[in-house]
Every structure is written in C-alpha cells, then in structure tokens.
Amino acid sequence: MSQQVIIFDTTLRDGEQALQASLSAKEKLQIALALERMGVDVMEVGFPVSSPGDFESVQTIARIIKNSRVCALARCVEKDIDVAAQALKVADAFRIHTFIATSPMHIATKLRSTLDEVIERAVYMVKRARNYTDDVEFSCEDAGRTPVNDLARVVEAAINAGARTINIPDTVGYTMPFEFARIISGLYERVPNIDNAIISVHTHDDLGLAVGNSLAAVHAGARQVEGAMNGIGERAGNCALEEVIMAIKVRKDIMNVHTNINHHEIWRTSQTVSQICNMPIPTNKAIVGSGAFAHSSGIHQDGVLKNRENYEIMTPESIGLNQVQLNLTSRSGRAAVKHRMEEMGYQESDYNLDRLYDAFLKLADKKGQVFDYDLEALAFINKQQEEPEHFRLDYFSVQSGSSDIATASVKLACGEETKAEAANGNGPVDAIYQAINRITGYDVELVKYDLNAKGQGKDALGQVDIVVNHHGRRFHGVGLATDIVESSAKAMVHVLNNIWRAAEVEKELQRKAHNKENNKEIV
C-alpha cells in the first residue's frame, strides 16, 4: 500500500509575501476555505508576531477552519512562539512552525553565531513550542546550502527536543533535483532518530526547479511537501502545489505515494487564489493554465479526436475543469442559476443567491446569453463585495473624443451622504478617478491597472484590477462590467472601501490594545 504525502500549503504566508497589496482578513479566510475544501492537510496562514492584523487573521482562520490543521510561523524567538500560540489556541488542534538558519553563510553573516549556538537555540525553542502543542515543525533555513553532516546534527537535536516534522528548505532555489534527493537520503542515513519525525521539503523556483526538487525529495523519502497554489511566493515563487499533486497522481506507477487532496477542487482553488491575489495565471502554466488542455496542431487534434489519451496524460475533469459550457438567459429563473452553480461545484456558502441573481439579470438584459464563465466572474465579485461599504457608486457619465478633453461626472454615496463631482482627465478612466478622488479626499496613487476579459466576444465582461498606494500601504480593488469605464470606476470604489475598512480595523485594534492596557492598570 502506498504511503501518504502530506500537503502543506503556505499560500497565505509565504505566498502572500509576493503580493503587491496585502490581503484583507476576509480575503485570507476566503482562500483558507477554498484550501480546506480542496483538502490540504496543513495550511500555514501567517506570521502572528509580525503585526496585529496578521495576528487577528491567523486567529480568525484558526477559529473557523476545522478539516485542515492550521499552522503559524515563528522564528526561534520566545516572543514569536508565544504570540503564535496565542493566535492559534482557539483551534481544535494546531501546529507551530519555527525555524532558524543552518548554512555556514547565514550563520556567519546573518546570525553572527556558530553551529553549536544555533543547535542550542533550536532545541530550546522547539521545547518551548511543545509546551503549547504536540505538533511542532522545525525548519533548517537554507538547508540546501548546509553541509549534510551539519544538517544531520541539527535535525537529530530538533527531533530529540520534540519536533514531529522536520522541514528541509531549498530557501534560495539553488539545488538540483539529484542533489536535493541526495540530501534527503543522506539524512536518513545519518540521523538515528529520523523515524520519529516526518521529513518535509520546501522548495523555491529561482532556477525553475521547485517542483522537480520536491518530487525528487519525495522519491528519496520525504513525506510532506510545502508549497503554494499557482506557485506564488518570494522572488520566482514557491513549489506549485497543483503540479506536485497531479504529478504524484499521474505518475503513481513510479512515485508509489498518494495525497488526500480532492483533485476536482484544484481548478477552482487555483482560480480563487489568482483572482483574490491579483496574480494572473500564465496561459501555458502546467495543470491550471488556460492552454494546458488546448491542442492547436492538426496532428494532435486528430490524435485527440481518435483517443484523448494520445495527447492527454490527464483530463480537464480530473482537476475540476468542466469544459461543457451552458448558457442561461434573462428568462432563466433563480432555481436554474442555483442549479448551474451547484453543477459547477459551488456551495450556497460560496455566494449570495439574491445578489448573484440580481447581477445575473442585469447582465442577461445587456448581453442576452450568460455563460458559465460569466456566472463565475459574477460570483467572485459577489463574494468580494459582501463586506459593509462606506462608498457606493450611484451614477457616472463620461464625455470624451479624439480631440476633446475627457470629462467625467460622478455621484457617490458616502455613508449617509450623497456627493457629486466633475473632473477632467487624460482619458475617461483618469477623469472618473479624478472625480472620485475629489469626492472622497483620499490621497491615492495608482500603481497598477489591469484589464482582463472574462469570457469571449465583444460583449464579454471586463474585469479591472487596480493597486493603489495610500500612505505607504498598497491596496487592491476589482470591478466587473461589460463597460470597461464602469469596471474601472467600480474598481476604484472597491479599493477606497478597502482603505476605509482597513482604517476601521486599525481603530478597533487600537481600542482593544487601549482597553487591555487599562485592564492591566486596574489589576
């Protein structure tokens, strides 16, 4: 019988570090729920000591997620471990993941320490983490550039201290697959107590070898793989989990291991991460790219028509990609929309049917037929706009031409008030943004603007994603409409609501901190 490979997802921790704009607590929870539905064994959801906001996000996810083990990162620092435990303690069961560098370069230049001191510190911190939970993971940062004999000493000491998972990261994506396999094999040969822990790997893609290194490590005995959906992460990214998962499934003949992942949720989880993180998936991306199952060569097309297995080593359906596209019209009822969402794998908790159906009817009136990709786009926007809105777009109009200065008029609901402004700009989008900024008074700098068609044809929905800089912090906004000017306006209103909500959250955190200090004084 094949052994299980544990899937450890770090999309919300290592993956988020690569984003241009930080995710809100709601967005993180949305991704966490998608990962839970896909069946990841462990999800690393943040670094609680880094900020009050991260602490709150970790705590919220730990409270809600039940079917995956929630994990938080901590340096080999007492405060890090204590704060991680505080954030996680609301979970039924949790993992603390602590780490310290072990390579000669990092020890000498970053830590200004010695290997013996590193081992002593690692042992102390693993024991401290064990005071809070039996599930402690220890990572040897930059293990790929650590001599295997040194690595073996650290690993043996960490296991003796109580670590139940030992992670071997290729932190800078330096090693080759045959080298990495040799490191894992070398640890099995040198560490006498290695059977008391699960060996994990965490690889980066600086040389394009993250997935290859992870698979080589699994073949050599590793039984946990860490990575992120779509491979997002620091620099060139992390190991793409969907690629490792499907490689293990497709090549079970030689890997002789399995995962407990629900493969049919891979496509939707990938899309969720891509949209929320504002990181488009390349067309030629393995497994989840839009061209992953496309056949343009005549020879290939002929072969696929005769037998799909001639040129397809897996099916789109195996990752949950339904290629049968049905269309609905304005005559389709709520029940039909709900039924189609269920057929596409959506649960009622994934969207608000009333709001979705209202948006569906408006779109159907505009373009006649509404396709699956339209419904999915509407459901995504529906989810993003569930939170309370301080600003709401009531009305806009734009006048522009080839030789005219663009002029926009905008009416916004701002809390209980309604305000209107007009402005000129360098094109219709800029004019609308100038008018909106006049109304709100927010000082924002547009740093990124992306427009993507959600579907096919001239009447396709256009999704606009923007990133703005506000007082040194970046925020993401998204808008969806058949009119790209309207999409752009909605994206700016969305980003301003995100800024407003972040300010409200900050006020609440300050209030809690103030109350906590007052309670200390009373005691």
UniProtKB/Swiss-Prot annotation:
Disulfide bonds: none annotated. Catalyzes the condensation of the acetyl group of acetyl-CoA with 3-methyl-2-oxobutanoate (2-ketoisovalerate) to form 3-carboxy-3-hydroxy-4-methylpentanoate (2-isopropylmalate). It holds the Pfam family LeuA_dimer. Its EC number is 2.3.3.13. Its main location: cytoplasm. Residues 5-267 form the Pyruvate carboxyltransferase domain. The lineage of its organism: Bacteria, Pseudomonadati, Pseudomonadota, Gammaproteobacteria, Enterobacterales. Pathway: Amino-acid biosynthesis; L-leucine biosynthesis; L-leucine from 3-methyl-2-oxobutanoate: step 1/4. It comes from the Bacteria. It catalyses: 3-methyl-2-oxobutanoate + acetyl-CoA + H2O = (2S)-2-isopropylmalate + CoA + H(+). Its cofactor is Mn(2+). Homodimer. The gene is leuA. This is 2-isopropylmalate synthase. PANTHER family: 2-ISOPROPYLMALATE SYNTHASE 1, CHLOROPLASTIC-RELATED, HOMOCITRATE SYNTHASE-RELATED. It is found in: Cytoplasm. Mn(2+) binds at residues 14, 202, 204, 238. Residues 392-523 are annotated as: Regulatory domain. Keywords: Amino-acid biosynthesis, Branched-chain amino acid biosynthesis, Cytoplasm, Leucine biosynthesis, Manganese, Metal-binding, Transferase. InterPro entries: 2-IPM_HCS-like, 2-isopropylmalate_synth_dimer, AIPM/Hcit_synth_CS, Aldolase_TIM, LeuA/HCS_post-cat, LeuA_allosteric_dom_sf, LeuA_bact_synth, PYR_CT. It comes from Salmonella arizonae (strain ATCC BAA-731 / CDC346-86 / RSK2980).
